[in-house]
């Protein structure tokens, strides 16, 4: 046919059988990729330390999505939560991967069948014998089925009625597990951090979809609306489908980057705003102050802080710290976290407690500045020692540790104090192993960053695709020079002007 690469889909424009075939093949590729990727991630995933070396630090992409829907155990005997797997059954990580690969194979066979048997009676109008699709009816069928699926997911899977529920955690991502969730029908269901709203909205949206599907199956569209929206044109279906997909992509990019109700921080890592706002730092300080108020010493108070919570309060776990073109998981950057060193409290020679100013998300290097309770700069690491006024040597800065490996230790040597001050810029101080994976010390983003970037970019591309195909279907008569509802068959070369019966070509004698 000699079609250029960007026009090859023309071959399925008026061929419903092969249009089904290529969609089946596409779904086969998606399911096959998902299953294969899951097996690859399972092969490289180290489940030994879910606290300091969780799946999101290791760059796992599909495993967190399985875990949030209730798949948390492996046939290998381990669990996402760190315990031993107890009777994972078929729906383990490996079972889900295998199911996707088997599904991929079946879809491939279905695609081949529909490619070979493309000219089915189903696609022909019994009155005329011409190829015809009842697109409004098909729309109703698809809407009904998707509504049924949406309702079933909310009413059965998420509620635990027939399914595991979903991943639920506390606001600080410390005690997460898979639990059944009751729907929240009140105003709190609109709280973006309330998982009960997710359940209620799936049930409600499913019911609306079922009703809408039945409506479109029983009520025919008015003729004017049918023509205005080009409901008889398959490219209208393409355009509106692309619109649905790009809208969904924009939504999930937003929920991934900003929220954590459906993307728990235990599975996908913290959001950048939790670092920006000192979210975990404030909670840690609140817990410490509460313990001290109850009579605990600073050492005891800091020792009660979960290592998991302290690890969230570390800049290297912010998804905004990694450049988009730095490939690899987080552990290939700063390394594999080994242990929490403890919370460093800095003081100057006059006994004032100093706070190290924390590194903002978009800085790779940042001056080491220590301020007192009033925000006055009392110490820094100068760029030029000749002009320094607040150097650690001049200010007599020391650091004492509470909790962690260095609990109870105090360092007075300026070289040691500077080392810990630089580390304190990044939040809580941890010891990292950079040798095992040959980590280069340059921060990487978490799967949260990759997912957001990918979906935002593709949403934008699909938005333009929607405009393109929408314009093609609405202005089809303008582009082709043929009216959309022209009844008489146009014979090319019969008329001097296409479709104008008064301008017949004169045949040469």
Swiss-Prot record:
Gene Ontology terms: cellular component: photosystem II; plasma membrane-derived thylakoid membrane
GO biological-process terms attached to the record: photosynthetic electron transport in photosystem II
Keywords recorded for this protein, A-Z: Chlorophyll, Chromophore, Membrane, Photosynthesis, Photosystem II, Thylakoid, Transmembrane, Transmembrane helix
TM spans (from-to): 21-36, 101-115, 140-156, 203-218, 237-252, 457-472
Membrane topology type: Multi-pass membrane protein
Subcellular location: Cellular thylakoid membrane
GO MF, one example: electron transporter, transferring electrons within the cyclic electron transport pathway of photosynthesis activity
A Pfam family reported for this protein in Swiss-Prot or TrEMBL: PSII
Cofactor stoichiometry and binding remark: Binds multiple chlorophylls. PSII binds additional chlorophylls, carotenoids and specific lipids.
InterPro entries on file: PS_antenna-like, PS_II_antenna-like_sf, PSII_PsbB
SUPFAM superfamilies in UniProt: Photosystem II antenna protein-like (SSF161077)
Family: Belongs to the PsbB/PsbC family. PsbB subfamily.
Subunit: PSII is composed of 1 copy each of membrane proteins PsbA, PsbB, PsbC, PsbD, PsbE, PsbF, PsbH, PsbI, PsbJ, PsbK, PsbL, PsbM, PsbT, PsbX, PsbY, PsbZ, Psb30/Ycf12, peripheral proteins PsbO, CyanoQ (PsbQ), PsbU, PsbV and a large number of cofactors. It forms dimeric complexes.
UniProt cross-references to NCBIfam families, sorted A to Z: PS_II_CP47
Functional note: One of the components of the core complex of photosystem II (PSII). It binds chlorophyll and helps catalyze the primary light-induced photochemical processes of PSII. PSII is a light-driven water:plastoquinone oxidoreductase, using light energy to abstract electrons from H(2)O, generating O(2) and a proton gradient subsequently used for ATP formation.
Record protein name field: Photosystem II CP47 reaction center protein
Organism: Nostoc sp. (strain PCC 7120 / SAG 25.82 / UTEX 2576)
Gene this chain is encoded by: psbB
């Amino acid at each position: 046919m000699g079609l250029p690469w960007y026009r090859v889909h023309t071959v399925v424009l008026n061929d419903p059988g092969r249009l089904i075939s290529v969609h089946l093949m596409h779904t086969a590729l998606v399911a096959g990729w998902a299953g294969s990727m899951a097996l690859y991630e399972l092969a490289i995933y180290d489940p030994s330390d879910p606290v300091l070396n969780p799946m999101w630090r290791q760059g796992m992409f599909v495993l967190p999505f399985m875990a949030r829907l209730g798949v948390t155990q492996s046939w290998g005997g381990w669990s996402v939560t760190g315990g031993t797997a107890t009777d994972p059954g078929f729906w383990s990580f490996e079972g889900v991967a295998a199911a996707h690969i088997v599904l991929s194979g079946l879809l491939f066979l279905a695609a081949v069948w529909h490619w070979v048997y493309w000219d089915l009676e189903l696609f022909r109008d019994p009155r005329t014998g011409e190829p015809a699709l009842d697109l409004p009816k098909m729309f109703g069928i698809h809407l009904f089925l998707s509504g049924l699926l949406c309702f079933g997911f909310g009413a059965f899977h998420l509620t635990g009625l027939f399914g595991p529920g979903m991943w639920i955690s506390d606001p600080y991502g410390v005690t997460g597990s898979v639990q059944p969730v009751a729907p929240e029908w009140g105003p709190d269901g609109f709280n973006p951090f309330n998982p009960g709203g997710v359940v209620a909205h799936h049930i409600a949206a499913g019911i609306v979809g079922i009703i809408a599907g039945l409506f479109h199956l029983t009520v025919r569209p008015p003729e004017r609306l049918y023509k205005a929206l080009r409901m008889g044109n398959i490219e209208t279906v393409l355009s509106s489908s692309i619109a649905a997909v790009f809208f969904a992509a924009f939504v999930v990019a937003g929920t991934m980057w900003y929220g954590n109700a459906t993307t728990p921080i235990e599975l996908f890592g913290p959001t950048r705003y939790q670092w920006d706002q000192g979210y975990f730092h404030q909670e840690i300080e609140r817990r410490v102050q509460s313990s001290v108020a109850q009579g605990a010493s600073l050492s005891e108070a800091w020792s009660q802080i979960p290592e998991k919570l302290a690890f969230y309060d570390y800049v290297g776990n912010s998804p905004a710290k990694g450049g988009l073109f730095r490939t690899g998981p987080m552990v290939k950057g700063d390394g594999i976290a080994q242990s929490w060193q403890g919370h460093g409290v800095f003081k100057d020679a006059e006994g004032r407690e100093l706070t190290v100013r924390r590194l903002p998300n978009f800085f790779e290097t940042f001056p080491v500045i220590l301020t007192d309770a009033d925000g006055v700069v009392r110490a820094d690491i100068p760029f030029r020692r000749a002009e320094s006024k607040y150097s650690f040597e001049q200010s007599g800065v020391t650091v004492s540790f509470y909790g962690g490996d260095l609990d109870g230790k105090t360092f007075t040597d300026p070289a040691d104090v500077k080392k810990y001050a630089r580390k304190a810029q990044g939040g809580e101080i941890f010891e990292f192993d950079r040798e095992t994976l040959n980590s280069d010390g340059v921060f990487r983003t978490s799967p949260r960053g990759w997912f957001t970037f990918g979906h935002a970019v593709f949403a934008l591309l699909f938005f333009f695709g929607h405009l393109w195909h929408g314009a093609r279907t609405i202005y089809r008569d303008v582009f082709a020079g043929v009216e959309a509802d022209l009844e008489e068959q146009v014979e090319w070369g019969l008329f001097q002007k296409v479709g104008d019966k008064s301008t017949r070509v004169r045949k040469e004698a």
